[in-house]
């Protein structure tokens, strides 16, 4: 009693045919649930599931084709694997990072339209080194705010710091919005500008 419900639902051995039989639903859970069915039936009351309970799942390659038709740019995030890497005896993190880029190459997408993203700095550095046309605008999603020694308002705690990242070829860094601005009294303070000035 008093403990919120939680669950982790994933698999590493699903086939493409099995994946295609699934239906997408709006993300949301009921933390007060006592059954699996109630847990996944967690759409907030102010939303509707009328159009969000039978979504057709797509592969990454299929999503590229759709976005090409819609004329959009691409911001794919290489998700952290839920399995130990290398997986299955030989599939490495580098293979995983390369596979994502290969699908854009196979579709003939202009690298300038792709902003590959990852919270794993090594992924971004891999793209910079091995796929420079894509790596030039690869995005480092900065998740270091979870580290105890990291203070987003104190550049002396940043490792690597902005200068180090720039030296490694990282041109775009994306921290959460709350790390970029703060308040002092009634004034909004641009932390990102203050941090930039720290290194100039």
Regions found by a protein language model. Give the residues of each.
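Metal-dependent phosphodiesterase/phospholipase catalytic core, i.e.
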Residues: 1-125, 129, 133-137, 141-146, ...
């Amino acid at each position: 009693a008093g403990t919120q419900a939680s669950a982790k639902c994933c698999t590493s051995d699903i086939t493409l045919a099995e994946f295609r039989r699934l239906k997408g639903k709006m993300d949301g859970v009921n933390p007060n649930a006592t059954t699996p069915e109630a847990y996944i039936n967690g759409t907030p009351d102010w939303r509707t599931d009328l159009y969000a309970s039978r979504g057709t799942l797509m592969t990454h390659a299929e999503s590229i084709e759709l976005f090409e038709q819609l004329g959009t740019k691409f911001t794919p995030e290489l998700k952290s694997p839920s399995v130990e890497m290398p997986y299955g005896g030989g599939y490495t993190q580098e293979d995983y990072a390369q596979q994502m880029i290969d699908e854009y190459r196979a579709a003939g997408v202009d690298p300038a339209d792709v902003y590959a993203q990852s919270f794993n700095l090594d992924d971004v550095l891999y793209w910079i080194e091995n796929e420079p046309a894509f790596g030039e605008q690869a995005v480092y999603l900065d998740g270091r705010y979870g580290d105890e020694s990291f203070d987003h308002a104190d550049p002396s705690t940043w490792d690597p710091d902005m200068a180090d990242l720039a030296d490694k070829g990282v041109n775009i860094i994306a921290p959460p919005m709350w790390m970029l601005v703060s308040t002092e009294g009634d004034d909004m303070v641009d932390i990102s500008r203050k941090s930039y000035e720290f290194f100039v």
